[in-house]
């Protein structure tokens, strides 16, 4: 299982990456593996303000439908529209081409509460 050291994580298996004033968000390799083959992704709208812990979309696999939660509070400035036609990118490359959304105006306290890769690894054990 892949677990990049430069990302931050949540106990709900989302990852967060700082990217020049914004934060890119997706689900972890562990999460996509548990879901199985992903067939559909419901994305939030650009311009939406989301609060930490809110359900902001869903991920449908051949096994189940799972809500996707905001790991931090912020404003949606981009969504990965490629996932509308190729949701399986989350399975094949969850940390790169399988990213889900990008937030700005993020609350720093939320970022500080995220887990390091080492701490997230302990959650998985």
Curated annotation (Swiss-Prot):
Keywords annotated in UniProt: Lipoyl
A Pfam family reported for this protein in Swiss-Prot or TrEMBL: GCV_H
Cofactor (UniProt): (R)-lipoate
Function: The glycine cleavage system catalyzes the degradation of glycine. The H protein shuttles the methylamine group of glycine from the P protein to the T protein.
Stated name of the protein: Glycine cleavage system H protein
UniProt organism field: Listeria monocytogenes serotype 4b (strain CLIP80459)
InterPro entries on file: 2-oxoA_DH_lipoyl-BS, Biotin_lipoyl, GCV_H, GCV_H/Fam206, GCV_H_sub, Single_hybrid_motif
Family, similarity comment: Belongs to the GcvH family.
Description of how the protein assembles with itself and partners: The glycine cleavage system is composed of four proteins: P, T, L and H.
Gene that encodes it: gcvH
Keyword Secreted: no
UniProt remark on cofactor binding: Binds 1 lipoyl cofactor covalently.
Database matches in SUPFAM superfamilies: Single hybrid motif
Gene Ontology terms: biological process: glycine decarboxylation via glycine cleavage system
